[in-house]
């Protein structure tokens, strides 16, 4: 089809997909997802969602006290997921670099939050975020990051 001038000197194109630049076409889905996941807004969003889930589980403890007495794990799941989101947000700030101090802070947040949420007391009754499990996670992260560095 031909283009017809709308205003003198300006033509209208029937196919707007031709206007897409070559740079936008060359980005693969993986590259676009990588840019989104590495953005600061996404990382802050993770922390905000985490805080929201923790607050939600605390509110549910007051709204549904009968459920909290019989099945406390149902109310602890959003809080645990929230704490994990907060820790992922903290660890991924500053271009993905994770210092030992940040990792130690996240381990303490995870262990303390689980300890408080399971029975309401700080008595080291953790079942999920134990020192052994967290050290395994740390070993896996180190292994995966060394593989990624060797491939690149």
From Swiss-Prot:
<feature type="region of interest" description="Disordered">
    <location>
        <begin position="1"/>
        <end position="21"/>
    </location>
</feature>
<keyword id="KW-0812">Transmembrane</keyword>
<feature type="compositionally biased region" description="Low complexity">
    <location>
        <begin position="12"/>
        <end position="21"/>
    </location>
</feature>
<protein>
    <recommendedName>
        <fullName>Sulfur-rich protein</fullName>
    </recommendedName>
</protein>
<dbReference type="GO" id="GO:0019867">
    <property type="term" value="C:outer membrane"/>
</dbReference>
<dbReference type="InterPro" id="IPR008436">
    <property type="entry name" value="CRPA"/>
</dbReference>
<keyword id="KW-1133">Transmembrane helix</keyword>
<keyword id="KW-0472">Membrane</keyword>
<feature type="compositionally biased region" description="Polar residues">
    <location>
        <begin position="1"/>
        <end position="11"/>
    </location>
</feature>
<feature type="transmembrane region" description="Helical">
    <location>
        <begin position="44"/>
        <end position="64"/>
    </location>
</feature>
<feature type="transmembrane region" description="Helical">
    <location>
        <begin position="73"/>
        <end position="93"/>
    </location>
</feature>
<dbReference type="Pfam" id="PF05745">
    <property type="entry name" value="CRPA"/>
</dbReference>
